[in-house]
Amino acid sequence: MVFSRDIPSPASMFSTYASMMGYVMIIKPMINTIIPRPVQNFVFSYLKSFAGSRSSTLTLTIDQMSSMYIPDELYAAAQAYLSTKISPNSVRLIMARDPAEKKVKLYLSDGEVVSDVYNGIKLKWRFLARNKNNTMVEEYGQSYQGNIQRESLELSFDKKHRDLVVNSYIPYVESKAKEVNNKRRILKMHCYSHMAQTWQSVNFKHPSTFDTMAMNDDLKRSMIEDLDRFVGRKDFYKRVGKAWKRGYLLYGPPGTGKSSLVAAMANYLKFDIYDLQLASVQGDAHLRSLLLATNNSSILLIEDIDCSVDLPTRLQPPTETSQPLGAVQVSKPLTLSGLLNCIDGLWSSCGNERIIIFTTNNKEKLDPALLRPGRMDMHIYMGHCSFQGFKTLASNYLGLSDENDDTHPLCPDIKHLIDGHVLTPAQVAEELMKDEDADAALEGLVKVLKRKRLEPKKCDDESKMKKLKEGEEAIADAELAVLTPAQVEDKEELVASEYANVMPEWLPRSRLVMVLPGFHRARGIRRGLGDEM
């Protein structure tokens, strides 16, 4: 039994507390004076770690970005996995609707906790989002300052299950995330943003497929077989010691379907596309950082590589301009060797299942280093529209059957007129879109084909007339400039150089002798040929 006299009065308790605080205020300055601050910090940290080590909970942190500012694949996999674990009892969620989708998506909000159970082990996921005042200094000399939101996930569990979680649960999360992503797979088109200093993406909804491509059937079949063989040979590439990548060079006139073929490849493989504009790359180091930030199972596209940027070669080093003392150092420009090292050198192995595509309108203008054997695995010529391509386009736009060659009375005429370099697939598609009626559309196409057939003859006639006119003017200039044999003896080299610029290559030698008899006789006498010339 507790008596009231055993309980201290409030006054005595307050007096005791005041006395203790007085002792602390006296002792604390003495401790700070006698014991150095580093020693105090060490003692406090040791005591804190000793007290914390008694906890049985282990927490693993997964950051959104790695130390090299590269998106962490494990973080993306965990986000996809947790999207299927959101409980109806969740308190805070983020709701968003993608412009290209109909469904509303729910995401974890800051501080939200999701519970999970794996093989009897209880685990807790916690989402964290924090803003940081960060100054990012890039190696190419530019800096950006602002509030940057860094996201992370914390996974907490009993520390005795650490090996099981790391070796079994995490791979399980990655496999489930892959299944989720395949079900809700939305292709993305990525481009580099100067403001964000990273890749930014939009949904890729291009309708092009191999079925809609106006290509030769054999070439189309060869492309599909090559892509299937590539994605299924992971072990083969590892066994032979090659990076798991594939390169394609698409070349041909404008409007022949190079970009549409890239879209068809992306839709067939379900690969994202990274559209790399070389003009936005500020050096070899910047290019490496951009390629390291791309995901696996993707397509790297560099369009119009012949005219996108002037790449210095090893034989043509970039010119260095002098800068004032104290000025910001500008990085060296992008070089051809830097590009080749990234797509075909040691850096190309930093990724798996990647496809690299170059497009150009003029293959002959490319540097020989880009065309050497083994650089790009396949060179695909995208030429003018053939009759087979026309049948595919007629089936797409007019609904005509492409099984035989006489689905329409005008097909034989079109087959005869379209052979050769007449129209590109884009031009044929433009004509077929002018009218929904098949008869009217095909009649218009026949008229265009006939007109295009006549244009080369007209151009040849005009070219011949132009050459004839140039020849007559050259002959007139030569007659006015004719020299005497004595002048030729003294200044033969000067005369020869003048006439080399005046005379056309196609002018017959007999005509030259008639115009310049003294000139040729003098050269003949000098060389011991007499009048035989």
From Swiss-Prot:
Q: What is its main location?
A: membrane
What SMART domains does its record include? AAA
Q: Which cofactor does it need?
A: Mg(2+)
Query: Keywords assigned by UniProt?
Result: ATP-binding, Hydrolase, Magnesium, Membrane, Nucleotide-binding, Transmembrane, Transmembrane helix
- Which top class of enzyme applies to this chain? hydrolase
PROSITE patterns named among the record's database cross-references: AAA
Catalyzed chemical reaction(s): ATP + H2O = ADP + phosphate + H(+)
Per the record, its GO cellular-component terms are:
membrane
Stated name of the protein: AAA-ATPase At5g17740
Where is the organism placed in the taxonomic lineage, from the top? Eukaryota, Viridiplantae, Streptophyta, Embryophyta, Tracheophyta
